[in-house]
Amino acid sequence: MKIPTKRISTLLFTLFLLSNHFTAISTAADSLGPKTRCFIEVGDPHISTFLQERRGIRAVKVDAESRCNFLQNNVILTVTIYKVGRFSDHFVKEFRTDPANPKSSGFRVKNWQTYRECMNEQETTYYGVAFSEAKINGKLLRTVKARSNKSKPLKCGT
């Protein structure tokens, strides 16, 4: 079957127009500015050896960091600890970094202050959730919530 030359010309012309159209869209999207590579890393719940050795406190702790390839300012990094319940999970503790603190700015901002003292040694499963809000290049940006990877039972009832 032979395709008429007019159809081939029309098809090629249409493809040419579409390729130019998508190139223009791609160029416009690239001109919006550099893309940030920011993310939250949430550590696994653990019994804090630091608190146990230095303060004599037995506590479950979750650490988190906000990392970005651009300078972050006035970061509020919120970390929440939950324990797994039979029918639903329960809030245990939440801590937010102070945006006015000089340590709340930089390429890497840490929140290692979220912990809850153990009341007994009952085996309990915990997990951490974190998100952050920061000023990057003058714009207020928020991350989606991130959850700790592993939840294992700890001998720490709250």
Regions found by a protein language model. Name each.
Residues 2-12:
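Bacterial N-terminal signal peptides that target proteins for export
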Residues 26-158:
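Mature extracytoplasmic or otherwise solvent-exposed domains
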Residues 11-20:
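Bacterial N-terminal signal peptides
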